[in-house]
Each structure stands twice: as structure tokens, then as C-alpha cells.
Curated annotation (Swiss-Prot):
One of its GO terms (biological process) is response to flooding. Gene3D superfamilies: Globins. Belongs to the plant globin family. Keywords: Cytoplasm, Heme, Iron, Metal-binding, Nitration, Nitrogen fixation, Nucleus, Oxygen transport, Phosphoprotein, Transport. Expressed in root nodules and flowers. Leghemoglobin that reversibly binds oxygen O(2) through a pentacoordinated heme iron. In root nodules, facilitates the diffusion of oxygen to the bacteroids while preventing the bacterial nitrogenase from being inactivated by buffering dioxygen, nitric oxide and carbon monoxide, and promoting the formation of reactive oxygen species (ROS, e.g. H(2)O(2)). This role is essential for symbiotic nitrogen fixation (SNF). Maybe involved in water stress tolerance. The modification Phosphoserine is found at S63. This is Leghemoglobin 5. PANTHER family: LEGHEMOGLOBIN-RELATED, NON-SYMBIOTIC HEMOGLOBIN 2. It comes from Glycine max (Soybean). It is found in: Cytoplasm, Cytosol; Nucleus. Monomer. O2 binds at H79.
Length: 168
């Protein structure tokens, strides 16, 4: 991988702000795709779910999901903001330091939850689709690449921490 540029960092930062501008909506988009909205209960039924359709075992990793993705659930938005923020922070680290160091708690948490390589890939796909929706016509191959590199690096750092933790 070449050096992560200031422009790539700026692309990630600006699109992260677009994501945060409508955090409740984009949090639901992150977990759902082609969902059915039940206006009586305000819930999103898990049909064609971005993450859970592709990796059903991941449902147990998100205790706040329950039986439906509730857009009013603050834990849903909080988790999405935290995850997207980690990727944004990864972009900053890549640009300033040339490498990403994961928070020490992320390895053990992901190990405890049993996160697999497939689930990392599914989250990456959902993240990219969500950012694409958040930025609309500002989406570009360059923007996609910046998010992909930043995600891949934080995922690699978490996987490394998971591997180190399993040796202890």
C-alpha cells in the first residue's frame, strides 16, 4: 500500500460528516437494505438485511438489535457512529503515522464475540454502501478506495490484536 494522502483523509472526513448529518437514518441503512418500514410501530423489519442477511450469526453480536432494527434505538446509532468513527480515525492515523494501531480493547471484544473474516468483509460492504448513500452524487472510486483502505487497515489491526490475545 502506498502512503495514505491528505486528500484521502479529507475524503473520509467529509463523507463521515455526511454520514453523521443523518445518523439515525444511516445507522438503519448500515444494518438494513431494502427494508420494510412498519409505520405503526416505527420498526424496520429485518428483510434483505445488509449485515444479518449475509452473516446471520452476527445478530448475536449486536445485543441491541433485538427482533428488529429500531431507528429510535440510541444504541444502534451509537454503535454505527463508533464503527464509522473508528474507520475515520484509521484514515487519520494512516495519513499522520503511516500505520493503524487499534484500541487495546477491540481485539478481546471481537474475539469474545467470535467475529470471523467473513463478518469483517460483510461489515466492510455494508459500510461502503452506507457511505455511498450518505454522500450521494459525491461518491467516486477515489472516495470508495479511501474508505476501503482505512477499513482494511483497522480490520487488520483488530485481527492482529485478536491473534495476539488468543496466544495469551
Amino acid at each position: 500500500m502506498g502512503a495514505f494522502t491528505e486528500k484521502q483523509e479529507a475524503l473520509v472526513n467529509s463523507s463521515f460528516e455526511a454520514f453523521k448529518a443523518n445518523l439515525p437514518h444511516h445507522s438503519v441503512v448500515f444494518f438494513n437494505s431494502g427494508s420494510v418500514h412498519n409505520s405503526v410501530f416505527g420498526l424496520i423489519k429485518k428483510q434483505n438485511n445488509r449485515i444479518l442477511e449475509k452473516a446471520p450469526a452476527a445478530k448475536n453480536m449486536f445485543s441491541f438489535l433485538g427482533d428488529a432494527v429500531d431507528p429510535k434505538n440510541p444504541k444502534l446509532a451509537g454503535h454505527a457512529e463508533k464503527l464509522f468513527g473508528l474507520v475515520r480515525d484509521s484514515a487519520v492515523q494512516l495519513q499522520t503515522k503511516g500505520l493503524v494501531v487499534a484500541d487495546a480493547t477491540l481485539g478481546p471484544i471481537h474475539t469474545q464475540k467470535g467475529v470471523t473474516d467473513l463478518q469483517f468483509a460483510v461489515v466492510k460492504e455494508a459500510l461502503l454502501k452506507t457511505i455511498k448513500e450518505a454522500v450521494g452524487d459525491k461518491w467516486s472510486e477515489e472516495l470508495s478506495n479511501a474508505w476501503e483502505v482505512a477499513y482494511d487497515e483497522i480490520a487488520a489491526a483488530i485481527k492482529k490484536a485478536m491473534a495476539i490475545g488468543s496466544l495469551v
